[in-house]
Structure formats: structure tokens, C-alpha cells
């Protein structure tokens, strides 16, 4: 168990307990300003403007959560998802990444760009391992103790060129993230079972220790256009083996964005 795992659980429980009295009807109360998600290098893009970088994309979400939204009290489910997303975001920022999107019970994050792809991949791997381990081995026992049904998590990641483009209208727009790497990372996350972390072929190619990888039974993915067929593999990442690096890596980074590191 890691110190980061304990912080993760504390963040979830603090938000879950502290927000119970914060329910308001929409439109009531003062409007407060909050910092939005996104990558600071691309926040200033104009409508239609696009730029790209090589980056590790990471997706984390809660498995079997749709069934929970069906059976359980809607406000309780919302509060639990919110609390876990807060902890997901904390892990990402502690490890120098950027939260690029929050949807329902899942998070999309980016790590980089940095000159050495192995750095982005290693840190994204540690972030995924930290979150999954924290839920399984630290948070869930504490939820059970409080009479709350445990949750399950999974992750997916890949690496490659990623485009940022501001899309929408002059009245309402946001920076959209597009590319094969983030798209395939999302597919990896969907291919993962509970407690699994699945990574794409290019991401896996930057993992030095091959014993950390196990070929996924559904690999490779086939892509066909006209008369040409190509394949792209994906693997299970043995995330438990990387937990030994979590606390020291967080201490070393101290929340500094990876792109600001001098390596």
C-alpha cells in the first residue's frame, strides 16, 4: 500500500462526507469561478486553430457503475462518482499530468509533451497503477466499514501524436482532443476488466521491462480500408509491479507538470 493510496482514499471520503450538505437546487446561491480542465499549452487556441504534441493519454473509470446508477439513490451515486473523480484528478496532477476531460464516472488525462517518450509512458503507468490500487486496497475497505458498497476501477492508455483544436462557435467552444492515441487509449480502457490496466502497442513499446506486459486475449485490433488490413496490438499492464515507484515519483515531481521538467 502506498502513501498516495491513503491520500486518494482521504480525498474521496472527505468529498463524500463534506458534500452531503452542499446540495443546492440549480440556480440557487452565488456563482463561483472554477478552473476548467485542459492542457495549459493549448488553452489559448482560437476557434478552429489546432496544434499537436506527442503525449501519453490515460483513461480511468469505474466499472459496472451504470448498474449502480440504476439501483441506488441518484444523489448518493452522483456524490460518490464526484468524490472518486476528485481523487483521480489529484493523482494526475500530483504526477505532473493534466486532466483533459471528466465524463460521468471517468477521467481522461494527458502526460507530456516531453523529449523522452519513456518518461510520459512511465508516469502515466504509475498514475493508472496508483488509482486502481488505491481503490482496490485502501478505499474499498474503508467504504465497506462505512456500509457503502465497494467500487471497481479500470484503466487504459496509449501514446502518440495528439491534436488539440478549439471547436464549437464564437458563443460556446472548447478545446477538443483528437488523435489515434487518445482514441485507442479509450478503447483500451473499455477492453479492460475490473482492476485491469490495458495499454496500446505504441505505449507498450516504451515500457523497458517487458515482464510488466501480458498480451491481451483480444489483441490485435484489425483495421481494414479498401483492400488493405493493418493490425495494432494491446496488452495488459501488470500495474502492481510499479507500485514501488509511486511515492518516490510523486515526491520527486512535487506536482510540477512534466513538460516543465528538465531531463
Which residues make up each language-model segment?
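Intrinsically disordered, glycine/charged-rich C-terminal tails and inter-domain linkers
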Residues: 1-41, 194-263
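Short acidic-hydrophobic sequence patches enriched in Asp/Glu that either
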Residues: 123, 127, 177-180
Amino acid at each position: 500500500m502506498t502513501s498516495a493510496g491513503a491520500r486518494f482514499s482521504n480525498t474521496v471520503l472527505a468529498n463524500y462526507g463534506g458534500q452531503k450538505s452542499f446540495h443546492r437546487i440549480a440556480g440557487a446561491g452565488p456563482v463561483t469561478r472554477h478552473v476548467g480542465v485542459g492542457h495549459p499549452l493549448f488553452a489559448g487556441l482560437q476557434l478552429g486553430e489546432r496544434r499537436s504534441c506527442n503525449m501519453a493519454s490515460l483513461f480511468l473509470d469505474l466499472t459496472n457503475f451504470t448498474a449502480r446508477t440504476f439501483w441506488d439513490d441518484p444523489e448518493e451515486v452522483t456524490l460518490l462518482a464526484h468524490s472518486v473523480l476528485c481523487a483521480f484528478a489529484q493523482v494526475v496532477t500530483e504526477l505532473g499530468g493534466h486532466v483533459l476531460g471528466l465524463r460521468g464516472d471517468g477521467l481522461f488525462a494527458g502526460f507530456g509533451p516531453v523529449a523522452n517518450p519513456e518518461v510520459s509512458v512511465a508516469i502515466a503507468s504509475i498514475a493508472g497503477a496508483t488509482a486502481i490500487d488505491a481503490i482496490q486496497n485502501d478505499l474499498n475497505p474503508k467504504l465497506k466499514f462505512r456500509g457503502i458498497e465497494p467500487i471497481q476501477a479500470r484503466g487504459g492508455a496509449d501514446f502518440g501524436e495528439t491534436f488539440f483544436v478549439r471547436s464549437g462557435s464564437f458563443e460556446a467552444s472548447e478545446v477538443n482532443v483528437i488523435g489515434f492515441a487518445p482514441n485507442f487509449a479509450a478503447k483500451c480502457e473499455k477492453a479492460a476488466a475490473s482492476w485491469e490496466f490495458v495499454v496500446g502497442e505504441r505505449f507498450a513499446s516504451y515500457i523497458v521491462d517487458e515482464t510488466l506486459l501480458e498480451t491481451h486475449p483480444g489483441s490485435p485490433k484489425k483495421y481494414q480500408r479498401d483492400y488493405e488490413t493493418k493490425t495494432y496490438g494491446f496488452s495488459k499492464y501488470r500495474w502492481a509491479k510499479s507500485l514501488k515507484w509511486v511515492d518516490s515519483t510523486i515526491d520527486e515531481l512535487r506536482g510540477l507538470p512534466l513538460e516543465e521538467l528538465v531531463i
